[in-house]
């Protein structure tokens, strides 16, 4: 069976004055949720990252009002993807207005109510519409989805989670992986915990989650000993016309999807960790 869509667990960000959610991630303990907001219908501060406190870890229905937020429009007016360093002291926001990844330093881990400052800006020159972003576990590889060209670009970081790109901290583009065989409009990206599975959301003509297995963890070079294999896709179109991003809880038994036009964060229960099946969703 495929994932079970749990309608009762849908989180309506529209009721929190958020109109176009782009991406969602959690703190490592699951008690904070961060939503990239590209447009706010009643004010001009819509290009921001919103922080919610969850009273129960990874339970999005336990979120209260917006606890804190960071306006990022001064760096990029079209924020799309978000990721944090493992420690939570660095936040990375990718935007397709400036085609860049902006790195912010947080005074307190996973807390936007603390002092948050822009640390580095890294320009993405491989695709004109960068969207989703992810890292391997130690931050020495960064993955950026190219919506325009249908690809995932991999970058090597000399220092983990450091985009300063100077002497000793070089950031290099090392390969490109095409998703066009599965989706021509990739947007969000996520990995399982050990990097042997990759999930890419397709948007528009193919509203689905595509699953790949990686022979070598977090390695998309797709050569001998590093094969990347497409194993199937899961249809999201019944729940969202524009799914943009996805993430999982800590053990991969719940999948969360950002439904942009519906202004929702959707929740799916999985029968086994990171097992999205390849059938239509079960409704509950």
Annotate each language-model stretch with its function:
Residues 1-2, 51-61, 104-113, 156-165, ...:
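Short loop/turn segments immediately following beta-strands, especially the blade-tip
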Residues 6-15, 64-73, 118-124, 170-179, ...:
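A short beta-strand motif characteristic of beta-propeller blades
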Residues 39-44, 98-100, 148-151, 204-207, ...:
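Short glycine/acidic-enriched loop and turn motifs that connect beta-strands
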């Amino acid at each position: 069976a495929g994932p079970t869509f749990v309608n009762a667990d849908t989180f309506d960000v529209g009721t929190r004055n958020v109109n176009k959610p782009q991406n969602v991630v959690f703190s490592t303990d699951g008690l904070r949720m961060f939503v990239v907001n590209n447009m706010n219908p009643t004010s001009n501060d819509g290009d921001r990252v919103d922080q919610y406190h969850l009273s129960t870890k990874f339970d999005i229905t336990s979120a209260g009002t917006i606890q804190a937020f960071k306006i990022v429009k001064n760096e990029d007016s079209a924020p799309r993807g978000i990721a944090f360093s493992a420690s939570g002291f660095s936040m990375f926001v990718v935007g397709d207005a400036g085609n860049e990844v902006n790195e912010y330093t947080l005074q307190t881990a996973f807390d936007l109510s603390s002092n948050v400052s822009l640390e580095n800006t890294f320009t993405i020159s491989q695709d004109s519409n960068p969207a989703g972003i992810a890292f391997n576990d130690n931050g020495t590889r960064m993955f950026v989805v190219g919506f325009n060209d249908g690809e995932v670009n991999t970058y090597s970081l000399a220092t983990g989670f450091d985009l300063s790109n100077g002497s000793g901290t070089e950031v290099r583009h090392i390969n490109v992986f095409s998703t066009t065989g599965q989706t021509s409009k990739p947007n969000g990206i996520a990995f399982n915990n050990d990097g042997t599975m990759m999930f890419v959301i397709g948007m528009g003509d193919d509203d689905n989650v595509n699953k790949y297995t990686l022979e070598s963890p977090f390695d998309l070079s797709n050569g001998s000993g590093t094969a990347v294999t497409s194993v199937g896709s899961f249809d999201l179109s019944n729940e969202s016309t524009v799914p943009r991003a996805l993430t999982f809880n800590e053990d991969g038994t719940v999948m969360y999807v950002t439904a942009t036009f519906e202004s929702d964060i959707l929740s799916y229960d999985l029968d086994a960790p990171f097992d999205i099946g390849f059938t239509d969703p079960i409704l509950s």
